[in-house]
Amino acid sequence: MTNLYFKTAFLLSLLLLSFSYQSKLIEAKEDKECNDSKCLPNPSRINLEEGNIKRIDVNHGGICDTYLECGGLACSDYRRACCVNGKCVCRKQGQTLPDCPN
């Protein structure tokens, strides 16, 4: 019976440890900038006055992905997405839209 308690306590501690590790990974991913295939700390995010716009560079297994966060929505391709009236809009190649980053 005592052995069962030790196993349960051990499994619970592993579970808690994995949750804390995942939350630290998420925090670390949110403040990264891509440079030469490496993600580096980025102190600045883009917050424009017109809306809640953030450019976030994230390292996914050594590959840097850039997202545009617009009013709580995340657009997967920053180069083709922009925030218009609080919504993410995906523009076509070569198309210009107001308030879109170039």
UniProtKB/Swiss-Prot annotation:
Annotated compartments: Secreted
Cysteine-cysteine disulfides: 39-100, 64-83, 70-88, 75-90
GO terms of biological process kind: defense response to fungus; killing of cells of another organism
Family: Belongs to the DEFL family.
Principal localisation: secreted
One Gene Ontology cellular component annotation held by this UniProt entry: extracellular region
Signal peptide stretch: 1-28
Protein name from the UniProt record: Defensin-like protein 285
